[in-house]
Amino acid sequence: MDLTVEPNLHSLITSTTHKWIFVGGKGGVGKTTSSCSIAIQMALSQPNKQFLLISTDPAHNLSDAFGEKFGKDARKVTGMNNLSCMEIDPSAALKDMNDMAVSRANNNGSDGQGDDLGSLLQGGALADLTGSIPGIDEALSFMEVMKHIKRQEQGEGETFDTVIFDTAPTGHTLRFLQLPNTLSKLLEKFGEITNKLGPMLNSFMGAGNVDISGKLNELKANVETIRQQFTDPDLTTFVCVCISEFLSLYETERLIQELISYDMDVNSIIVNQLLFAENDQEHNCKRCQARWKMQKKYLDQIDELYEDFHVVKMPLCAGEIRGLNNLTKFSQFLNKEYNPITDGKVIYELEDKE
């Protein structure tokens, strides 16, 4: 019985159960190109389903990758009717929070105290304060996920069968994935406090008839739903992206161990920017040969360390992989592994930018 794991993502691309797919790794290894490629291939292979690609990276490269502007609201990729993109903007989300707080303070200003609070918050004071909190980007990204789940459950707006996350570099991503457990513990403590001090807190905060305990319980239930889904291998998986160099391999191993500690499924690695040995002299200089020799050394280590993973080896292309056309050409090698002999010409077809 052949137990060899396929060196491609065909099983993931054709999966009908996955709701959440995270794509992450060290900075500069091609995470955005990889996440765009996965999203495109899934959309092409399952035309009757809707897919959403979300950037949780503050750098926001989806617009650059596709060559069109995306924002905080999901918008279809031009040329595809079942793939949408959105870029979570923490600064815009903080401004919305600040405006909401100003409105709330002004509405509760009948006793004169709300006017003072409203004046204090005018000019973005809340946004300035919270914007400096470590991990706020990850928290806001997590809030967007929660809002998306709630809209899906209530049948509001467009529904998506699968959400692909183009994540921030490793440290940010790990903080993001820790949030369900962290929030669950935090809300447990808040629940104990509000059960004892709920009426006093309502009075102090001018919350009127707002049931703080009820709101916390609702939030806790939503967080628990996400935690359960993120740890279900049929619903969620993480695709690691790296290049064939020591530091990238080291960080990939650290990332995988962390993901395992979170009980999150991880069984795929995309190795980008591989030169591959070429037979023709025109494209096989001494520097290329030396670099391929170095890459091959770490590739052998990856194959040995992760023999039960889908290890996808992607070529370094002659030009930038930008625009839907180039991304589609490149992404085919996630579904069917790249062969330097038969597919080598494709990497030079991408030499001219769209």
Swiss-Prot record:
MF (Gene Ontology): ATP binding; ATP hydrolysis activity; guanyl-nucleotide exchange factor activity; identical protein binding; metal ion binding; protein folding chaperone; unfolded protein binding
SUPFAM superfamilies, per the entry: P-loop containing nucleoside triphosphate hydrolases (SSF52540)
CDD domains: ArsA
Residues that hold ATP according to the record: 26-33, 245, 272, 315-322
One GO CC term, this protein: endoplasmic reticulum
Entry keywords, A to Z: Arsenical resistance, ATP-binding, Cytoplasm, Endoplasmic reticulum, ER-Golgi transport, Golgi apparatus, Hydrolase, Metal-binding, Nucleotide-binding, Transport, Zinc
UniProt entry tagged with the keyword Iron: no
List of catalytic residues: D57
Signal sequence residues: none
EC number: 3.6.-.-
Presence of keyword Magnesium: no
HAMAP family in UniProt: Asna1_Get3
UniProt name for this protein: ATPase GET3
Species of origin: Saccharomyces cerevisiae (strain ATCC 204508 / S288c) (Baker's yeast)
Name of the gene: GET3
